């Protein structure tokens, strides 16, 4: 037996390159090992580990890892080959059939050839003709601003790109269709990110995945040659099935199976080898959809039967924030996934006794509920109802009659406990009067019973229905429901909060019952279960209801209780403190008016010079100002809570209305100004900063050290602010400031050199308008000329001068000055400054940081990067050679292949840049190690097309070339 295996292995080594892996063959055809022969003769347990390694190597597979891993790798290879052969055979048969049909058709006297484009609109053909013409393409895009943000430079589909661009799918589709050398998708990790991102089950997403599979398969003729060897779905079928299941993407998995016509046995094997059984144990709504789908096409291996929902979060299925249609689908997926009748029988056999009477009772209840739901027709559900949340439906439920629906077919919910469970939900024209709340309750009850029978029957203590289930479906008094909270939920603070808020906001509960609840809490009826220090939970529930009647009743009862208490014993806070503590919950003007008319003397936020106004929601500030102005009172603002989220917005409001606000800042405000700018940039509040700087003059220059640490993460958020800062700053004024640095460099020691410069931003009506236009495009807040340039009179308030600001100063480092100019598309100005002041800008202490990889990598485009490279080549010196090398490293890391192709096409540049410096070639700039590092960066970034281009062109030794190629093979 061993000798026979040895012969087979030798045959593999001699013949494995031949493509004859037909799974239906009875033996080894022409000496080749087939899937059946492999499974028959090479058992994972008895086969020698060394023999498996030889087979793996002969097939071009990795041979490292444990024995079972190597075995699974070989098995997966054969499964993929089977799918590929089936796909090829199908296409061959279709081509032969098509050829026969064409031969049978009468031949025209003169042949006419028509080029057709599948799935492409006629007008789109002209677009692609322009798009693929590099000369026209570059000419068009050279006229666009913000070239560094052009999508044609995007390399790789990472989370930043996929989540940061709302049209990321369209960009990928355009890039695939363009079929140019600059492909966004570079490797399998990019594909995995795509699978993790696009999961919606609609026609657009399904079409997207079909395009993806057609381009990245071994039969594709459109794919660039360099990518076809690294990404082929049909060469790695089992691994892609694993990735789609683990990323819980039903749409991709469904289209993948259909596109490549993968049979159930291949899917079963792939799941068994690569997907852990526990994946389906932690059951979610979306995982259930995949599980039921695989089950419906008979593709679930016996080892992966759905575990009994051990790690399932019941609250996710029963959330009242879910849409009604999701509740129906949850019910469907749960019931379809499990044969409850079979589970009952298995439990009886396992225990060798009849099932516990209580458990049997629950199974019977569930069966009864399923039968009841089978009788429900869904014609009374409108699209609005199906797309509404359960919470909203329960707050507006009335008996509903039959309503118009988009479908006219008739069927019912059909569910049984038999192995052939079936469920359909369509519409019927039958007239019906059914209470929607009762229907929702039946679905909830069924899901609860299902989980109890499947998971919690062995330990009833662990099972409890959500609190909202009792609050919405149990027809009990408020007192009775509160007892349930205490008995079933042990009276936790969170449950008390949920209970009080739900009761007080429920429009279906009578006001008298709510009044009774308030009275019972204040009279200590629940003192044993509701501690006094937890009263703030109840207070918050009352004020958050924003119900004037409830709040008024509550405050009057508090007042009565306080009158009955001695001065030394004050159980509850004062009325004024209560209202002030919860004023942030006020969400409508009527509540403010209510306090103003009835509790003005008690309310702290109606006092003169109060600071509590900062807690009132910004949407209500204008009405609040009107009330304060009507009684001649003012609010106070200092910088004590400068880090609050809306502080700068409130400061801008206060600056514009000095009759209502008094502002007082001492010298410490200069210290916190940087943090204020930083926090508002992170919160996308660039307009708030611009408003502030336009209406308040700092007595010291604004330091922009924040740019040093925060520029990279917040580049797009800062763009409007940067435009505002540099709008009226010319390159000549920057040159003047840099000349001062140059003088200091010549005459002072290094320690005395100040690497920062101070610039002045001039504010004019034109500046304001420009800023406003830009801001309007990028944010929802609009800024007008009027509110930027008022008030007219200046006023000193400590370290600030409030009033119309004509200009302000700021300091910025030379490095960040260059970065800002770059992001404003003022690269021509950078080149101008290079020429005028090379001794300053090319000073390693200043400029080297700008060209460091971590800085320029995040902002560079191929367009500008090539511009810098060409400039450094034309101005080579001891400093610029280092900057040139850094730019080449970035181009390699980002996969800008065209930059290197342009260098190679130039005989002079290629000799300087991409040939190794030796004794015989002193004209070259870089030694072997530096050039090797450039190639390694492209390999580590999985840009293999560029890697192979550089390996072939650079005159590395044979040893170095082999070493680099091995790095590529390991990452493929």
From Swiss-Prot:
Keywords: DNA-binding
Boundaries of every SAP domain copy: 44-78
Molecular function GO labels: DNA binding
InterPro entries recorded: SAP_dom (IPR003034), UPF0746_actin_org (IPR051904)
Region of interest called Disordered, as start-end residue ranges on this chain: 1-30
Biased composition (Basic and acidic residues): 1-19
Similarity comment: family membership: Belongs to the UPF0746 family.
UniProt name for this protein: UPF0746 protein DDB_G0280785
Origin species: Dictyostelium discoideum (Social amoeba)
Lineage: Eukaryota, Amoebozoa, Evosea, Eumycetozoa, Dictyostelia
